[in-house]
């Protein structure tokens, strides 16, 4: 009886995982795929909704994050450093603030997000992705996640996880940014 129960539970888990994967769109997580357009309508630190089509000839780094995520907030100084270092050389960083579901800790509130941006010294544009349109379009699963888009609008690199100014991951992302800026 225990074996039968284990088989049934195992089968149920496989079906749930397979069903979840089937519901989610097949989305680029590797280079060579055109970047899905941003359809977010609520923006902070930008006087209008940004569209990737407007940013051709610029390298774009998308940062999927949420202000209650410790890994995300510890990565912010690295992103602020990239913004200061490369903004005038052709890099645009866009934060995509994607709250958890169900609403948690006021993450869906635009005022709370605005205060978090000020508190963390973030001046680059941020889209509020409460409905997870960008999150789903890019196939994101973890906070923080990053997508690096070249000047032609093609995804070249994607990854996730916390990194800090001057650690190995920071240097690797820095190298990739410089490479795309030089193309």
Tell where the protein language model's regions lie, with residue ranges:
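Hydrophobic membrane-insertion alpha-helices, especially the h-region
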Residues: 9-20
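N-terminal "domain-start" segment that seeds a small globular fold
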Residues: 23-52
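Short active-site neighborhood of thiol/selenol oxidoreductases, capturing the structured segment around
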Residues: 50-73, 93
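Structural micro-motif
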Residues: 122-125, 139-147
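Structural microenvironment flanking redox-active thiols in thiol-disulfide oxidoreductases
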Residues: 73-120, 128-136
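Loop/turn elements at helix/coil->beta-strand transitions in domains of secreted/extracellular proteins
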Residues: 56-60, 88-92, 121-125, 151-154
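Positively charged n-region of N-terminal signal peptides that target proteins for export
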Residues: 1-5
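Thiol-/selenol-based redox modules, centered on thioredoxin-like
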Residues: 148-183
């Amino acid at each position: 009886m225990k074996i039968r129960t284990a088989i049934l539970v195992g089968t149920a888990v496989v079906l749930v995982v397979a069903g979840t994967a089937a519901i989610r769109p097949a989305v680029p997580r590797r280079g060579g795929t055109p970047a899905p357009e941003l359809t977010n309508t609520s923006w902070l630190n930008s006087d209008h909704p940004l569209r990737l089509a407007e940013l051709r000839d610029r390298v774009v780094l998308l940062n999927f994050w949420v202000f209650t995520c410790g890994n995300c907030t510890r990565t912010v100084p690295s992103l602020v450093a990239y913004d200061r270092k490369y903004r005038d050389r052709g890099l645009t960083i866009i934060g995509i603030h994607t709250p958890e579901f169900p609403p948690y800790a006021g993450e869906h509130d635009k005022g709370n997000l605005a205060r978090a941006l000020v508190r963390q010294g973030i001046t680059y544009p941020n889209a509020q992705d409460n409905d997870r349109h960008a999150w789903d379009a890019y196939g994101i699963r973890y906070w923080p996640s990053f997508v690096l888009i070249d000047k032609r609008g093609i995804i070249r690199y994607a990854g996730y996880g916390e990194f800090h100014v001057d650690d190995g991951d920071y240097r690797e992302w820095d190298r990739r940014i410089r490479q795309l800026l030089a193309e």
